[in-house]
Amino acid sequence: MINGTFYYEEDKTMKRKTVVALLAASMILSMAMPAAASDSTEESTEVTTEAATEAAAEADASQPITKAEDLDPAIAATTAETTQELPLVANEGDASFSMFVDDSSATGEFVMMDELKKQTNVDVELRLFPYETATERLNLDLNSGDYADVIAGWTLSDSLILNYGVNQGVFVPLEEYFEKSCPKITEILNLKGVREKMTAPDGHIYSIPYVVEDDLVGYTPYINGQWLENLGLEMPTTTDEFEAVLQAFKDQDANGNGDTTDEIPFSTDPNNKHIEAMAGYFGMPMNKKGLAIVDGETVYGGVSSKYREFLSWFSGMYQKGLIDTELYTQDSSTWEGKGSRDLYGVSIAYGSNEFSGIARGPEKSVWDVLPVLNTENGGIWLRDTSGFSVYRTQVVVTDNAEDPELICRWFDNAFSLENGIGISTGPVGTIVTKEDDGYHVIDKSTLSEEDQEKYSWANLWPQAVSKYMPAGFRLVEANPDYDEKAAVEKIYEPNMTEGVIEENWIDMGSIDTYADISTAIKDYFEQQQAMFVAGEQDINDDATWQAYVDGMYALGLEDWLSIQGISTIAE
């Protein structure tokens, strides 16, 4: 129970990229979330304005900024301690609101939710559902009218905001509350490019902003370096070499446990498979929607010959037993469980710790990022962000809320600098201390096992919910964790697309059409991909492939792309 009734649907566990994708436990990323993550439902938009790009670049190029006053003035303006008069209500229990969020917490206990209750006297009734079931549950709630006061997390999308906000009024406009009572959120909206990205086609802002200094690349394949060493293998650089490595993993006792049959050469995050990204090895760097960047232009690659070439290669490996047979059926806990038993040679993930069972620490683990393959023949990886993103579909307030203004003020207080530090790293005064030269993180290894778990990143805050840290701001760490994402970016940077795929609001007159076609195309793309990979449909049969292509067009592919301003379908 947290600040009221605790709802939790017992199901598969999940560590959201996003959650993990945006903020590593040992790093304080800007304007803090995500994964990127990219994932199947999140809507992130790139702030590609010159000012935003330069701010992110300067943050990386200079010495770490550990004092807020040393930040760029526009960003520094967002770092003042709370401008809310606390507590928000006179007595504990005088006010409350409910919040639906996708999160796989086993206990529902979050350190900073308790801290915010102490600060505000506002009870928050969390309704937590694992991501695997959250979308279905949210749809049921919205259809029944029995939805929470606040809906948060990766289940939201532009389509939902346009439908339930612009069209139906279930999600309420928030900009008047921001201007009246939320000076910190207002300063965040005033950062260059943010307000424009947050504003829906009808001129309203329907969500709490989530602005983040983002990773250039989210999900990538990680390869077990210890297995390579055990078998005397080199890091592969081509798809042929990669397949040969996977075959060796399968045929030999790569994990050294004496059993030559338990190795699983390749797997991926069940909820963020991202296998289509590997079409980039064949010159078609794609995202989960089938969109790609070719020669600097956003195109649709989901019916292209290069995507088919990738599917043929990947399906061939599946038929040879090199791919996890549970690729399309396992849940997160199964994936993580197999990884923690050292059964994987390669897995796609946001970070290797998501599945390996190896905790972050100052030393690099045995896992290496797999480099982009076939680079000498046009292999390229899709750049996810330019280093700075606005997530505009993370938190909405519904018409069931009795006091939307109070909810906005609660978030405005949560966005204070020290609350942001607490949400991302740990409470100031417990895990972080304020010194003359900035905020210092204690060595968490000195904590008891119980406290290490209590103050772990996942237990600080339901991390799918909006939070904020200023761009470029860093904590002082005497013994920082190994920065795996920085290593990924260093390896991938030379072989990534220069541009990113932009997400734009849909024209008001096209909302219903877009929503209907989007669902149909997404489902068809994913279902057909699974059937091709598993061999239920022959990817190498021309008639079968043409039937797939014809089916995509029949669903309205051209209209779907036109609504998004995309004119090219790669052949």
Predicted segments, located by residue:
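Conserved small-residue motifs centered on glycine
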Residues: 101-102, 409, 413-531, 536
